[in-house]
Regions:
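Extended active-site neighborhood of metal-dependent phosphoesterases/phosphodiesterases
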Residues: 84-85, 91-96, 108-110, 172-237, ...
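Membrane-embedded segments
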Residues: 100-102, 114-202, 207-210
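Conserved beta-sheet core of the metallophosphoesterase superfamily
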Residues: 176, 261-340, 344-345
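Active-site metal-binding loops of divalent metal-dependent hydrolases
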Residues: 127-131, 159-161, 190-191, 215-216, ...
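Beta-strand-turn-beta hairpins that frame and shape the catalytic cleft
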Residues: 102, 111-124, 209-210, 217-230, ...
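Short beta-strand/loop segments at the ligand-binding rim of alpha/beta enzyme cores
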Residues: 246-256
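Acidic, histidine-bearing metal-coordination/catalytic regions of metal-dependent phosphoesterases
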Residues: 14-122, 133
């Protein structure tokens, strides 16, 4: 393992920070196959001569434009229609302005069950802050500024908030500065069940945030609604192997918030229209799309970006922001996710 790590670090040192910001995987779909070709998506997308990567990269002239403080280069990564759903995505490099966050990944999520009142509804999603690991106080303050700048309607959080109970209060005190019309919701990660669970729950409630542990809440607007469901400890399937979405109506638009992406394959998450997860850190250390250590038992299938479970339910997996074990990221840029909802009208 030390030899592998040293090799990865040497490779990383040969690349600039901007070049190490990976583009999003692009699902490859055809009439005979619903799922992305995982081998192509992982083994090929980060290779310099891969045709899909060439499509995603911005032009050389745009890369050389250093006058702008924030890059507005966008990378179209997927455009598909599946079971009444259309999803497109782009990324914006913010690493030159904000400490601790490399990019904002934006999704336009179009679905037939999105209510008209929620057309243009913006969701900010963050996960795996692991405060204070790689994310320090300045990075946290920059993260708050960046989240405020997104003007989201709701903030969702995917767990693994801290690397010590002494960091819980300052973390949520800072995040409380992010005010959204529909509030802030969060689930717990494995770190949060190992330590500080009660501190986190109580601190979130103190700052007006809503922890969701096998619970659902309804967001209402102009007489219409969408539902946010949150999973309690997804690693304990003996207690939590029944999804909180099963009792919901298939007519509602339902977002499932869960720490690990494996959960949506391990159990039935019927009535879910979109799932959001973290946990993987995008591999955390990844060179040419290959990570020596993966914390999903589905391997490369659920690592980062847009994926689907066997029931064809779309899942967005974030790289997250912080780190665990080693305070380093290579080829897995720290990111926040912004999702804009649209109603499919065709």
């Amino acid at each position: 393992y030390p030899v592998i790590l040293l090799t990865l670090l040497l490779l990383a040192s040969c690349k600039s920070k901007k070049n190490m910001v990976a583009t999003l995987p692009r699902p490859v779909l055809n009439s005979d196959s619903i799922y992305p070709d995982t081998a192509n998506a992982i083994a090929g997308l980060f290779s310099p001569d891969h045709s899909q990567l060439k499509e995603l990269n911005v032009s050389k002239n745009k890369k050389q434009n250093t006058k702008k403080k924030t890059s507005t280069d966008t990378h179209e990564s997927s455009d598909l229609v599946l079971r009444g759903t259309k999803i497109t995505s782009s990324s914006v490099d913010v690493s030159s302005v904000y400490t601790g966050v490399d990019r904002v990944v934006k999704y336009d999520f179009t679905h037939r069950d999105v209510p008209e009142a929620f057309e243009g509804f913006r969701i900010a999603f963050i996960s795996d802050l692991h405060y204070k690991s790689l994310l320090k106080e300045k990075g946290l303050n920059d993260l708050v500024r960046l989240l405020i700048a997104q003007k989201a309607d709701v903030l969702l959080m995917g767990g693994d908030y801290q690397e010590g109970c002494e960091y819980v209060e300052p973390l949520f005190s800072a995040l409380a500065r992010v005010k959204t019309p529909m509030g802030t919701y969060g689930v717990m990660g494995n770190n949060d069940y190992e330590r500080c669970h009660d501190d986190i729950v109580n601190t979130m409630k103190h700052y007006g945030m809503r922890p969701l542990e096998h619970e659902v809440d309804t967001l209402r607007k102009d007489g219409q609604q969408i539902i946010i469901a949150g999973v309690r400890n997804p690693f304990d399937l003996g207690r939590n192997g029944v999804s909180p979405t099963l009792a919901l109506s298939p007519k509602d638009f339902v977002i499932l918030l869960v720490h690990t992406p494996d959960y949506i394959e391990d159990v039935s998450v019927a009535n879910t229209d979109l799932a959001l997860a973290g946990h993987t850190h995008g591999g955390q250390v990844r060179v040419f799309g290959v990570a020596p250590a993966l914390n999903s038992h589905y391997g490369n299938r659920f690592i980062t970006g847009l994926a689907y479970n066997s029931a064809k339910i779309p899942l967005i997996i974030t790289n997250g922001i912080g780190t665990s074990k080693l305070p380093i990221r290579v080829g897995a840029p720290a990111e926040i996710i912004v999702i804009t909802l649209h109603r499919l009208t065709e």
